[in-house]
């Protein structure tokens, strides 16, 4: 299933990631010159521009450097360009993919330049959400059939007289315009511009206890700060989203995957084995994401704090 985008470093780049959404510019040219280098104890990881993906890389980088003795370079790359970079050996691993069947067919099955690195252990899901305080006041708003009833309350200056459905970046893969059209809803999709901008807007609405309807996804640390309730869309069935123009169903629940450059997977030694074994829970990821995004720790500091408290989890990845 195509999810977050059609395309979820160092501490300095980590800070940049918090300010950008899933539509950050293609940075493949920043790829490490050591990526896929024979015999080099250097690993280059792709970082997507949302905090959950940053949490994965932060912990993997910390353990690779402090427990296995590797140097780790990280590169910010949009999701689809990341597949190209991975195939070319510009990066060695991608730790959180939300589903790109076209790229999987091309690079994994046909060209065999990329291999599946196993499940991350986290299940991703996109949906429409309203704040829980609004859902408690109006329980029927959680059924899409009743959304038009509340369109006037969800109208904003940007939505042109219709209710507002807030999305993130225009570069995200989203079915929302088709859903609004095919479900004949009196709503306008309005893009915040990035994940960070969307979070800022959600927090502002919540501070003022205003109603809002937003495209959002799990896992995401913000749920702990702003409780939200999902709106039930028509049930997802396999293939219901095959034609982007005709989508009229909910988004699926997708086990997130890791992918490795094929040569790296074969010759990457302990680093490749470690990345294949890296597997944690939604709770683990959210714990690190909160440390980075809410408590403002650097990615390395957040990773160290998690590593110090979860040895029984990560020790198995080093075998």
Where in the sequence are the language-model features?
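An extracytoplasmic/periplasmic, membrane-proximal ligand-sensing/linker region
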Residues: 52, 172-188, 192-209, 270, ...
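Ligand-binding pocket segment of bilobal, Venus flytrap-like solute-binding proteins
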Residues: 85, 91-95, 164-242
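C-terminal motif of bacterial Sec signal peptides marking the signal peptidase cleavage site
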Residues: 17-21
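Short, polar/charged alpha-helical segment
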Residues: 51-70, 180
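A conserved helix-loop-strand patch within extracytoplasmic ligand-binding domains
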Residues: 113-165
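Bacterial signal peptide processing site
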Residues: 23-26
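Short, well-ordered beta-strand elements
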Residues: 38-52, 70-75, 162-166, 275
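A bilobed periplasmic-binding-protein/Venus flytrap-type ligand-binding module shared by bacterial periplasmic
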Residues: 126-136, 254-267, 290-291
């Amino acid at each position: 299933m195509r999810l977050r985008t059609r395309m979820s470093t160092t501490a300095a780049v980590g800070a940049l990631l918090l300010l950008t959404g899933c539509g950050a510019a293609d940075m493949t040219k920043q790829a490490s010159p050591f990526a896929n280098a024979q015999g080099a104890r250097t690993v280059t990881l792709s970082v997507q521009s949302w905090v959950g993906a940053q949490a994965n890389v932060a912990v993997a980088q910390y353990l690779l450097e402090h427990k296995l003795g590797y140097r780790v370079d990280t590169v910010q790359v949009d999701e689809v360009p990341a597949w190209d970079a991975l195939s070319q050996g510009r990066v060695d691993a991608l730790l959180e993919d939300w589903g790109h069947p076209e790229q999987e067919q091309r690079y994994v099955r046909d060209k065999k330049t990329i291999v599946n690195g196993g499940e991350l252990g986290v299940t991703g899901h996109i949906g429409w959400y309203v704040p829980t305080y609004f859902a408690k006041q109006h329980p029927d708003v959680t059924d899409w059939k009743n959304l038009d009833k509340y369109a006037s309350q969800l109208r904003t200056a940007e939505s042109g007289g219709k209710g507002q459905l807030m999305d993130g970046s225009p570069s995200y893969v989203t079915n929302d315009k088709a859903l609004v059209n095919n479900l004949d809803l009196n709503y306008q999709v309005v893009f915040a511009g990035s994940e960070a901008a969307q979070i800022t807007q959600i927090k502002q609405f919540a501070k003022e206890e205003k109603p809002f309807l937003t495209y959002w996804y799990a896992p995401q640390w913000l749920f702990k700060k702003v409780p939200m309730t999902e709106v039930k869309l028509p049930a997802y069935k396999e293939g219901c989203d095959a034609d982007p123009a005709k989508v009229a169903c909910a988004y699926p629940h997708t086990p997130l995957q890791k992918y490795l450059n094929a040569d790296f997977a074969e010759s990457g030694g302990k680093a490749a084995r470690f990345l294949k074994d890296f597997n944690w829970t939604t709770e683990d990821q959210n714990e690190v994401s909160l440390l980075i995004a809410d408590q403002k720790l650097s990615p390395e500091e957040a990773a160290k704090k998690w590593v110090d408290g979860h040895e029984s989890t990560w020790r198995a990845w080093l075998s």
